[in-house]
Regions:
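Class I S-adenosyl-L-methionine-dependent methyltransferase catalytic core
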Residues: 1-183
Length: 183
């Protein structure tokens, strides 16, 4: 597993040996960031405008990829000890990488919504819906925030009340749901 783009391209990332952590593949990350970069260009924005939140961060590969591509800051929410150990090691070479050791279904309050949220919860545990609702309640997102949720293809994409789907992409056995908060 490695960073696939930006100034840290090719940097190898440490991954835990446990079965619980399932990093987003290099191919899916590369596709995701091609989509995000295109979206930013259409909205006349740059990566340097973006505060990125990687929820259920695991190794931190997605949030670190955002930093490698020039994001202003990446925040990581993780509470699984083996994943945290890898995340801390992987993030050590990056400025503006901030780890929040917390349960994403009960995040801390913030008064500063982020621009992009990526969420890759353990499959079939119904955690992403709870986390999305909690992030909304605790101030992490607003109508401008783009949310990407990685789920297994067989999972239903029933968004919590107050959110709408803007895109849905399949990558092997995984899907990426792109959504926003209703205005």
């Amino acid at each position: 597993m490695r960073i696939v783009g930006g100034f840290k391209r090719g940097k190898n990332l440490m991954t835990p040996t446990d079965e619980k952590t399932r990093p987003t593949s290099d191919k899916a990350r590369e596709s995701l960031f091609n989509i995000l970069t295109s979206m930013l260009m259409r909205e006349d924005k740059n990566w340097s405008d973006i505060v990125f939140l990687d929820v259920f961060a695991g190794t931190g590969a997605v949030g670190l990829e955002a930093l490698s591509r020039g994001a202003k800051e990446s925040l990581f929410m993780e509470n699984h000890p083996p994943a945290l150990k890898c995340l801390k090691t992987n993030a050590a070479d990056f400025e503006n990488a901030h780890i929040l050791m917390c349960d994403a279904t009960c995040p801390p309050f913030t008064t500063r919504p982020v621009q992009i949220i990526f969420m890759d919860a353990p499959y079939r545990e119904e955690l992403w819906e709870k986390a999305l609702t909690a992030l909304k309640a605790k101030g992490w997102l607003d109508e401008e925030t783009l949310i990407i949720v990685e789920i297994e293809n067989s999972e239903e994409n029933i968004l919590p009340a107050g959110f709408h789907l803007t895109d849905d992409r399949s990558y092997g056995r995984n899907r990426l749901l792109f959504c926003r908060l209703n205005a």
